[in-house]
UniProtKB/Swiss-Prot annotation:
Annotated site, Cleavage, chain positions: R278, A279
GO MF: cytokine activity; growth factor activity; type I transforming growth factor beta receptor binding; type II transforming growth factor beta receptor binding; type III transforming growth factor beta receptor binding
GO biological process: ATP biosynthetic process; cell-cell junction organization; cellular response to transforming growth factor beta stimulus; chondrocyte differentiation; epithelial to mesenchymal transition; extracellular matrix assembly; extrinsic apoptotic signaling pathway; hematopoietic progenitor cell differentiation
Cellular component annotations (GO), alphabetically ordered: blood microparticle; cell surface; cytoplasm; extracellular matrix; extracellular space; nucleus
Residue positions with a glycan: N82, N136, N176
Protein family membership: Belongs to the TGF-beta family.
Record's function text: Transforming growth factor beta-1 proprotein: Precursor of the Latency-associated peptide (LAP) and Transforming growth factor beta-1 (TGF-beta-1) chains, which constitute the regulatory and active subunit of TGF-beta-1, respectively.
InterPro entries (UniProt xref): Cystine-knot_cytokine, TGF-b_C, TGF-b_propeptide, TGF-beta, TGF-beta-rel, TGFb1, TGFb_CS
Signal peptide: 1-29
Disulfide links within the chain: C285-C294, C293-C356, C322-C387, C326-C389
Protein name: Transforming growth factor beta-1 proprotein
């Protein structure tokens, strides 16, 4: 009787022959990084941010809300915060690489403000100081399915007439009925119509990541300390009633709207899948089925997600996180298998493959109270801008 090893030889020969025919075939997407549930990753990221903020401020626990004075922030503190935020945004814009998709044409869409007669406006107190503009986010998502596809967004208003010079300010509505300052404009007197435009790209991107059905802006007269009259003198088309027939139709078509410029989804997917991945750090995820290391968008609302009311500005921010496999080639004609075995022997608990980690991070300016004293601080490395395999 032949030895047992010889009896197994006929069974091993077909397997050896198959391996010889495919010596250089890669193991597709091979990675020892564990598959992670998306919701679990988000929850862990939120909890990590909770500890990160407290640690950076050297706080053992969130500050008490009992001593915080009611009312808006002091004007000097708000001005300091706005200038810090603008400086950070300016530095980010200088280092932002031009995406490949910017070379191609953008689809332009107009989303009209919800008509002024809608019951949504009944929730806002009538005021001679401000006007309100609300938008249906389902129409926004229909025009721009993914936040990363948005190239630019402007809110445009048709000013009909203005008898005196006036300083106006634009605010963004938050879910807790507070308002965040965005921009301002000094308007000169004029009897002829003129379109006013405000860049609200960041705000609309934020709306696209949230689940609110209605979002809005407020246009207000600047509240000057030395002025007793804070009435909004600007006549904006779309905010008066009583018009009939064709005049009402024209009036409604020219009401405030969002002008959106975005890369069509099918074009973005084509560009994303066809270009070489030598620079993973510049890629944002275009869908939930992304198969490469990329930046996943995650918006943190301080009140909703962390239960915090002590951070006064901002109300939230895009923290983001990195996720996705980092595939490598494992060929039978290389010595990599020997190195891998040696690595696993000395590091049994570590990942044998590169993992998706943050590469570029941005700071986050905040306003919070210590007792009754407001403070402006800049927290370093809070926003994930790009990722890499490491």
């Amino acid at each position: 009787m032949p030895p047992s090893g010889l009896r197994l030889l006929p069974l091993l020969l077909p397997l050896l022959w198959l391996l010889m025919l495919t010596p250089g075939r890669p193991v597709a997407g091979l990675s020892t990084c564990k598959t992670i549930d998306m919701e679990l990753v988000k929850r862990k990221r939120i909890e990590a941010i909770r500890g990160q903020i407290l640690s950076k401020l050297r706080l053992a626990s969130p500050p008490s809300q009992g001593d915080v004075p009611p009312g808006p922030l002091p004007e000097a503190i708000l001005a300091l915060y706005n200038s810090t935020r603008d400086r950070v945004a300016g530095e980010s814009a200088e280092t932002e690489p031009e995406p490949e998709a910017d070379y191609y044409a953008k689809e332009v869409t107009r989303v009209l403000m919800v008509e002024y007669g809608n019951k949504i406006y009944d929730k806002m107190k009538s005021s001679s100081h401000s006007i309100y503009m609300f938008f249906n986010t389902s129409e926004l998502r229909e025009a721009v399915p993914e936040p990363v596809l948005l190239s630019r967004a402007d809110v445009r208003l048709l000013r009909l007439k203005l008898k005196v010079e006036q300083h106006v300010e634009l605010y963004q509505k938050y879910s807790n009925n507070s308002w965040r300052y965005l921009s301002n404009r000094l308007l000169a007197p004029s009897d002829s119509p003129e379109w006013l435009s405000f860049d609200v790209t960041g705000v609309v991107r934020q709306w696209l990541t949230r689940r609110e059905e209605i979002e809005g802006f407020r246009l207000s007269a600047h509240c000057s300390c030395d002025s007793k009259d804070n009435t909004l003198q600007v006549d904006i088309n779309g905010f008066s009633s009583g018009r009939r027939g064709d005049l009402a139709t024209i009036h409604g078509m020219n009401r405030p709207f969002l002008l959106l410029m975005a890369t069509p989804l099918e074009r973005a997917q084509h560009l994303h899948s066809s270009r070489h991945r030598r620079a993973l750090d510049t890629n944002y995820c275009f869908s939930s089925t992304e198969k490469n290391c990329c930046v996943r968008q995650l918006y943190i609302d301080f009140r909703k997600d962390l239960g915090w009311k002590w951070i006064h500005e901002p109300k939230g921010y895009h923290a983001n996180f990195c996720l996705g496999p980092c595939p490598y080639i494992w060929s039978l004609d290389t010595q990599y298998s020997k190195v891998l075995a040696l690595y696993n022997q000395h590091n049994p608990g570590a990942s044998a493959a590169p993992c998706c980690v943050p590469q570029a991070l941005e700071p986050l300016p905040i306003v919070y109270y210590v007792g009754r004293k407001p403070k402006v601080e800049q927290l370093s490395n809070m926003i994930v801008r790009s990722c890499k395999c490491s």
